[in-house]
Amino acid sequence: MANSRQYYPSQDESMSPTSVRSREWEGPSRWTEYLGPEMAASVSSTRSSKQIDGHVGGSTKALNIQWVVQMIEVADGLMAKMYRLNQILEYPDPVGHVFSEAFWKAGVFPNHPRICTLLSKKFPEHFSKLQLERIDKFSLDSLHDGAELHLQSLEPWIQLLLDLMAFREQALRLILDLSSTVITLLPHQNSLILHAFMDLFCAFVRVNLFAEKIPRKMLLQVYNLLHALSRNDRDCDFYHRLVQFIDSYDPPLKGLQEDLNFVSPRIGEVLEAVGPSIFLSADTRKLRNEGFLSPYHPRFPDILTNSAHPMRAQDLANVTSYREWVLLGYLVCPDELLRVTSIDIALVVLKENLVVTLFRDEVSLYQMVCEKEFGIGISFASADSINLTMQYILLHEDYQLYVLPRVLESKKMAKSGRTKQKEADLEYSVAKQVEKMISEVHEQALQLCDTIHRERRILLKQEIGRMVLFFTDQPSLLAPNIQMVFSALALAQSEVLWYFQHAGIASSRSKAARVIPVDIDPNDPTIGFLLDGMDRLCCLVRKYISAARGYALSYLSSSAGRIRYLMGTPGIVALDLDPTLKGLFQRIVQHLESIPKAQGENVSAITCDLSDFRKDWLSILMIVTSSRSSINIRHLEKATVSTGKEGLLSEGNAAYNWSRCVDELESQLSKHGSLKKLYFYHQHLTTVFRNTMFGPEGRPQHCCAWLSVASSFPECASLIIPEEVTKFGRDAVLYVESLIESIMGGLEGLINILDSEGGFGALESQLLPEQAAAYLNNASRISAPSVKSPRVVGGFTLPGHESYPENNKSIKMLEAAIQRLTNLCSILNDMEPICVINHVFVLREYMRECILGNFKRRFLTALQTDNDLQRPSVLESLIRRHMGIVHLAEQHVSMDLTQGIREILLTEAFSGPVSSLHTFEKPAEQQQTTGSAVEVVCNWYMDNIIKDVSGAGILFAPRHKYFKSTRPVGGYFAESVTDLKELQAFVRIFGGYGVDRLDRMMKVHTAALVNCIETSLRSNRELIEAAAASMHSGDRVERDASVRQIVDLDTVIGFCIEAGQALAFDDLLAEASGAVLEDNASLIHSMISGIVEHIPEEIPEKKEIRRIKGVANGVGVAGDHDSEWVRLILEEVGGANDNSWSLLPYFFASFMTSNAWNTTGFNIETGGFSNNIHCLARCISAVIAGSEYVRLQREYQQQHQSLSNGHHSSENLDSEFPPRVTAEASIKSSMLLFVKFAASIVLDSWSEANRSHLVAKLIFLDQLCEISPYLPRSSLESHVPYTILRSIYTQYYSNTPSTPLSTASPYHSPSVSLIHASPSMKNSTTPQRGSGSGSSSTAAPDSGYFKGSSSSLYGQEHYTESETGNSRNNENNNNNKQRGSSRRSGPLDYSSSHKGGSGSNSTGPSPLPRFAVSRSGPISYKQHN
């Protein structure tokens, strides 16, 4: 061979495959490659001890057993290599000669399908007879050119064929040796050697059955062709021997039946001996009724017992092996079925199984037979499942093809009379029964196998559950019953593996190729119960492992005395044992007597290696069970059984078993309780888990067991194939991650079920606590209700009776969901970390991330509905509902989930530091990771409310303090998302960061609008200056001409209205913030309010004072929100920095000439105008005040800078008034200028032909005086008599509140040109609302900006411009604070006489018609002006 091997005798010999001839009989050392490191080390140590040890007989006999164990390991190694070859070749079909495209691209065989496939089909014909040059000369030439390269790729697999051939010869020799020399192979006498013998027998069968799955024929033929092409047409040395070997095992079962014919009688004896244990394991009723797997006494449950049937229960641990012996034994030794007792044994096992596993997930099946004759299919797994690669041949078809013909032949021979008549009749009868059994058992298996195993799984579920409860309560009884625990684990292991081995199998009832899938229910909940029971039982054993070791040590200590006593009995003395055997017995006693005594809690500290004891006992067994020994097992039993106690060998076997509980308890537990083989079905495992975990019978606590299975998956990897270790570990990690994903998906599902309209949402639609209290109070007042009618006056049932009985199921569903949620959270919280390779999975952390991640996803999902933004109040209720569920789960975990939810809300709300509080910048790494939710909400408010990009007709309603729309904005009207309750919900959700973000966005938007105003102011400066001069000079013509030339006046008005909307919205937001702060942090709110009252009034303001004012303005406790807000904007953008801003009053006064007034009307229901022009008043007042503050602040800064430079003396800087008073006086002066000239323009523009806009403009000016804290209400009185305004308001408020003033034709009469219709005109069409007092009381509470009474109105007329601003400022602050209370009465609240006159049904003329025909009104005012 090209690849040298470490066990070759020399380098030269190892260079050629022919060296196998010199290595065939080297013994176990030649198999080092197929053994693990531990087994290889034991081989070398055994060889060295053999050379040193003088006890030739004993050590040689013991070495034979070691060889048996090694050959079993070699079989696993050979099958691992074949399994790997099949994987590389993408699972070919060598029987049907079907090879995929991936097969040829794998790099093992030359990519010349025609020649290679022909060689395989024509096996065993030599290639020289096939005339390959005629088949494909090009491929043949290519093979000749690359022969050496192809030989190197095939040599490792040719060596595998040689090793298979050598294994056959050595294994057969060992099997023959054991069969011919061991005098007894009964489970109760010689179980250790029996298991070694049968394990080797089954391994031999499996290797040769599995060998057919690799392309042996093609491998040998192609290799020989390449060898001949490169060696002058000379065949390789081993060609003919391999041809004979492969041909003899084609098909494998015929070769196996011939090779194993010589051991057939011994196999039949063994299978008959294990029959009782198989019958017992199949009888679930007997197992349950007689308590074979129960620590309770079968007939007296109150009496505790070690085990009802200790020996038989212990033997149940081996039933899985016994079943495999039966299935494979009768398959390769069919003559043994003709025993009378064998029929029932085979029937029981065949009825329960459809397949036999060969290696890992490979099963004993012939693909050709399945596809061509039986139509095998897959019904359980998905199309991409790994199990699609499994090559199925059903077990029953194997029996029909290879066992039934032998039975029929025996039947024919018996019928022909070739044997004695009596024996012939018996043989014929038995053969006929076997024939009937084989023919019928297939149908029975298809119908009953799943039912049988489901019943067995239910039994094991119950018994293991009882065991766990019992041993948890009585741990001291676990150690004596440890063998019974192993039996229960082994049976459960067998059932779980059977379930997944048969998942996806489909069979046929006849040769008509009708595919009948085996009904393996993927929703079977018993699998989860078994996994959980096994896991908990193993945990109990590990928990009390010291107690089990202590019990075993005490048993062995007592066993030493019993064995010493038996060695001194007369029978043993009379046997005259040879020195070798006697020495071994003495060493056994010494081993047992040298065991340290178990004392109290020091058991865990005892280290005791009993491997030498077990080796010596195996040596004794090999001697006394050998037919060549003068003293055999029967002699020893007869010599010691007369004592009335256990025989010598029985004592030794029991001591051997208990010794394994001292130093090999973990390996014993792993053997019986490990489910590592489930790795090969892990995709099915995942499917069943998902179907059952959260099903009606699923249990949250089972997820621990499903996950812990993965820890043992990497143990399935073969050490001789290094890449498997990595792959299996990676698959185990992926399996755990997949299950964790399913578990967390289920956890999310439970939370989402509760957090739905059908969950806790349905409870929210029931009676509120106040309603329930009223309902109970009402019910308690009913005396002695009738029994027949439990209803009360309101139609409700009395307490104790169901109002909606159909809701019972929903309530029970909620209770079940809550129970599952709390159980699952508790289980995940208490679960130990899952360790797979170097990965550690802590389920508590996954649960935390799941709950918090689910909350974040649901929060972001609930943020927007299908139509548009979710209402903040609804979003808040959803958050509270979800947090209630999280709090429910939090009670069962040791984690602070509430803190995590707060962090999520903070993360979604934090878009940067609060501008008025923080001085740091937002970290760069948080630019894209925080504030996503608040950005969505703020952008929506900006686009749909402030900017109205959808054109929904957004209007601000001062009276109700919200924005309204003429059509829905998304899914809601604007009023349902902008009132104070909704904004307070927004503040509670997003906190100060959300408020600041929305405030900053409105500031940026308003800054852009103010910049447009400044741009227009500068571009029209000359025209505005000319208009201002003409206004002062009284030149109306020049004024009108200049105003008409101002560019884009209507556009600027639109900008100002939009800025006013932003001011109004920010004012609402500040009020909502203040209300929330007062509710949740009243001390902080009162502290801010107190600080604002004592802030020093100075210009320029210090940075700290400015920040405090910003905070106060943000929570609605500042004196003037609008002007302070605009002032901050102008300071940030550097506005109002030139003299053009002094023209603002004149520029704003020119707005009175705009066409916007022609399309507006006042609406008393909203307290505003139909085109939102009342927001212009806020903008004008705020911009004038803000710009004046900024202008004066800059002047003072410049003066102080000049003073510091020594240009002026300090006396020049002294002022008569404080800077704040000066600023307020300047603002008041500018506002009075605006009012004066605006009123002048309004009244001058009125004429008989154009008077429809007059009322709107007058109301606008009145509202401006009301809004501005710097103007007295009487400011307009000097220009427009208040009798006119009172008449206008009386006309509006005595009519229908929702009737706006629309555009009227200039040709209408005066009474119609000023209003829609007078009350007298409305009387015929619209019913009166009642008396004036009634109408005023209806409209008064929510009339918006207007002051409360006539005294308050006219009390302000005594203020003049020369009054000091300090007292004015204090009054303005107080008025601003009381705006929501004292100004709610509206303009009609002048006096009772006015109310009565304006709203009565008297026949006298109404005030507005009197004003319309009077010449003492606006005309005389205009002339006076």
Curated annotation (Swiss-Prot):
Origin: domain of life: Eukaryota
Residue segments, region Disordered: 1-24, 1299-1425
Pfam families per the UniProt record, alphabetical: Nckap1
GO CC terms in record: endoplasmic reticulum membrane; nucleus; SCAR complex
Organism: Arabidopsis thaliana (Mouse-ear cress)
Tissue: Expressed in roots, root hairs, hypocotyls, cotyledons, stems, leaves, trichomes, and flowers.
Recorded family membership: Belongs to the HEM-1/HEM-2 family.
Segments of skewed composition (Low complexity): 1362-1405
Residue spans of biased composition, Polar residues class: 1-20, 1299-1312, 1320-1329
Coiled-coil portions: none
InterPro entries to which the protein is assigned, alphabetical: Nck-associated_protein-1 (IPR019137)
UniProt-recorded name of the protein: Protein NAP1
Quaternary structure and partners: Binds PIR.
Function: Involved in regulation of actin and microtubule organization. Part of a WAVE complex that activates the Arp2/3 complex.
Protein's GO biological process: actin filament organization; actin nucleation; multidimensional cell growth; positive regulation of DNA-templated transcription; trichome morphogenesis
